[in-house]
């Protein structure tokens, strides 16, 4: 018995002596993925209760790069380079080149939803695994997608040339809880937001288009063009609880007032 206990104790000591695996290096960078236009009225289009009066806001078009160890997630791909008036001044491929990254180094392209200002440059990353909400993927691959869902940027994945993972609910992207795609439907059927837990800055909640500006978020405003009002309100409620529970910084992708919450590219939050 004593020999057995001694052997067990020795094994336990050996196990405890194995150093814990170091947490992967993480960072979050913002790209400008479209050309902002003059401030525009938001009352009717962005509130189905006409809540915003004469409010005018300038919209920005944000994409994000998450570094997780040696892996990268690109969150949204902005406007196409051919988009009239709002096309980016610099392509995502050229922006990535500034930090010595090539398209085939991007492991995942995560899409918040299927609208053109979030999907325009997806085709530049055909070797990346596409992460997109199941509901949105179903729309894109349907016989007659609606006009606001353009399948063209996803042609390689639709044909089966690239790997796609339709996401029906939440997805722990890297398997360690540090980057989570959050199911927040309502704006589109499969809409997702993103929670990134940075070691220094702390958790960051990236909205997608769950809300377009802080007045949307603060008042539970529902745009008139959302696909489901009840889902939108439920998603806003869930998002606020996630933000509170994680003490997360809220970054609204289209709100120009949130651009400075992250360092200016090529710097990144850590």
Region spans (language model):
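Bacterial N-terminal signal peptides that target proteins for export
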Residues: 1-9
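Metallo-beta-lactamase
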Residues: 16-105, 134-183, 201-208, 244, ...
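Short, electropositive alpha-helical surface patch
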Residues: 82-83, 91-92, 131, 186, ...
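Active-site metal-binding motif and surrounding structural segment of the metallo-beta-lactamase
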Residues: 85-132
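Bacterial N-terminal signal peptides
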Residues: 9-17
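Short acidic/His/Gly/Ser-rich catalytic and metal-binding motifs that mark active-site loops
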Residues: 39-41, 82-84, 139-141, 214-217
């Amino acid at each position: 018995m004593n020999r057995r206990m001694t052997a067990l104790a020795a094994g336990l000591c050996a196990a405890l002596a194995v150093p814990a695996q170091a947490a992967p290096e993480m960072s979050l960078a913002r790209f400008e993925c479209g050309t902002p236009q003059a401030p525009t009225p938001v009352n009717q289009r962005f509130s189905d209760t006409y809540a915003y009066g004469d409010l005018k806001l300038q919209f920005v078009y944000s994409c994000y790069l998450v570094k997780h160890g040696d892996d990268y997630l690109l969150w949204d791909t902005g406007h196409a380079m051919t988009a009239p008036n709002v096309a980016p001044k610099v392509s995502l491929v050229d922006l990535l080149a500034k930090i010595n990254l090539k398209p085939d180094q991007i492991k995942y392209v995560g899409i918040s939803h299927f609208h053109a200002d979030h999907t325009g440059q997806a085709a530049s990353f055909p070797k990346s695994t596409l992460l997109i909400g199941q509901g949105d993927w179903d729309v894109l691959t349907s016989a007659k997608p609606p006009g606001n869902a353009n399948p063209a940027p996803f042609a390689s994945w639709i044909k089966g040339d690239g790997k796609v993972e339709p996401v029906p609910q939440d997805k722990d992207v890297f398997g360690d809880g540090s980057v989570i795609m959050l199911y927040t439907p309502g704006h589109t059927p499969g809409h997702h937001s993103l929670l990134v837990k940075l070691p220094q800055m702390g958790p960051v909640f990236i909205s997608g288009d769950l809300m377009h500006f802080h007045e949307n978020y603060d008042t539970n405003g529902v745009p008139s063009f959302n696909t489901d009002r009840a889902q939108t309100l439920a998603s806003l409620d869930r998002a606020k609880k996630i933000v509170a529970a994680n003490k997360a910084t809220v970054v609204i992708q289209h709100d120009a007032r949130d651009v400075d919450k992250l360092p200016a590219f090529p710097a990144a939050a850590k």
